[in-house]
Amino acid sequence: MTEPEFWKHKPLQAMSSEEWEALCDGCGKCCLHKLEDEETGEVFYTSVACRLLDLHYCRCTDYQNRVRKVPDCLSLREELTEALKWLPSTCAYRLINEGKELFPWHPLVSGDPETVHQAGISVRGVAIPESQAGDLEDHLVDWSVKD
């Protein structure tokens, strides 16, 4: 059983599998194709979704086998240090790692998994399937959150 507000006092490395999975807000941004500037290391998001992402629910359709089916897919828990730079600034894993609070729309805070979509944070209605994308550079998006 997950303890209430576990994310406020427990580091990522100490979380149970259940707690770790509960941290995911379901935005789907980690499943978008990204481009990295080789000179600066800056990461750019596209609106192009991985072929395994359900574009309505913003969840992986084959979560257990995703790393085998999509070799570029990062297993966050196993590759957290490398993965952090690829995660959006709103991502709970990144926020907790940086000692920050979760946003009010996060399902753990709001109690409702739809708030991430209602707040316009998820890729619902924005992402397109990779099978229809063509050149990734044609689909760059700015997901930055202004404080």
From Swiss-Prot:
Disulfide bonds: none annotated. Signal peptide: none annotated. It comes from the Bacteria. Belongs to the UPF0260 family. This is UPF0260 protein Noc_1358. It comes from Nitrosococcus oceani (strain ATCC 19707 / BCRC 17464 / JCM 30415 / NCIMB 11848 / C-107).
